[in-house]
Amino acid sequence: MRTQKVFTTIDTHTGGNPTRTLISGLPKLLGETMAEKMLHMKKEYDWIRKLLMNEPRGHDVMSGALLTDPCHPDADIGVIYIETGGYLPMCGHDTIGVCTALIESGLIPVVEPITSLKLDTPAGLVEVDIFVRDGKAKEVSFCNIPAFILKHITVDVENIGTVEADIAYGGNFYAIIDAKSVGLELVPEHASTIIDKAIHIRNIINERFEIIHPEYSFIRGLTHVEFYTDPTHESAHVKNTVVVPPGGIDRSPCGTGTSAKLAVLYANQKIEMNEEFVHESIVGSLFKGCVINTTNVANMEAVVTKITGSAWLMGMHRFFYNEKDPLKEGFLLIPPMEHETEDVK
């Protein structure tokens, strides 16, 4: 078969949300840090992200991971997180999906009952424990980068009213909002309304507030909106729905969103150190999380969290890139997000 370029992926889902892990075909990325490699990817090879994420090969909430050589001397593997909306410094459900794919495809040595990895990500070093039985990844736990509350805001939003939100970071920036306060019921049949309100709120917040990570200036702008409400699953403490860029719903409880939520709960003395917290998604899937340590980020109080979830292997793809295909980079039928990742400073 004659084709110009071939990309091989392993597809998994974590709590219903997809991860497409690219295992071959990625050019060598340059940079002394994973953030620099991510920005090199964006500048020179963004067409690969579009090919793999956008329709007709992907869909509006497709996400994935690119495996690279790590930059950190203690890391085993470098990971860059991608989605239809662009690039993420960190992604929890993708981390669970990537590690499950690595184990079950035999790409890394497997140690039972626990295989430990250190991932180098644009957000920092992430330590992972994969619980393995009979060669299968049963659960994945990762210690996330420090999570913190950046600010609490109140903003008037046209056609919605006064919105109160905690702007919290757990690997991405989240506006964490009580769903009932903005007239939302977090059920699949209300998905369109949830997305519309989230995008409207996100745009207003980005217009009126400066949101920048105090240590990594390339991480800026509100990208995710996380609504929460009472749980419906008997094992859960909170039910959430996260709207991801550019405008789709995370089917999982969202790993970095769970870290951000734990930062809010801990700061408000609503959860204790090492107390288990179970987060439910809009489709009923669950993540477990807990605060395992405290730290500081630029003189702000922060927490280190451990997030646990499971992913499922779905299959493999070989994608062919044909220069003559008029839709070689795909398309999206939703508006692009205005926020852009800036250069590393």
Curated annotation (Swiss-Prot):
GO terms for molecular function: 4-hydroxyproline epimerase activity. It comes from the Bacteria. Pfam families: Pro_racemase. SUPFAM superfamilies: Diaminopimelate epimerase-like. Belongs to the proline racemase family. PANTHER family: BIFUNCTIONAL TRANS-3-HYDROXY-L-PROLINE DEHYDRATASE_2-EPIMERASE (PTHR33442:SF5), TRANS-3-HYDROXY-L-PROLINE DEHYDRATASE (PTHR33442). This is Uncharacterized protein BA_2834/GBAA_2834/BAS2643.
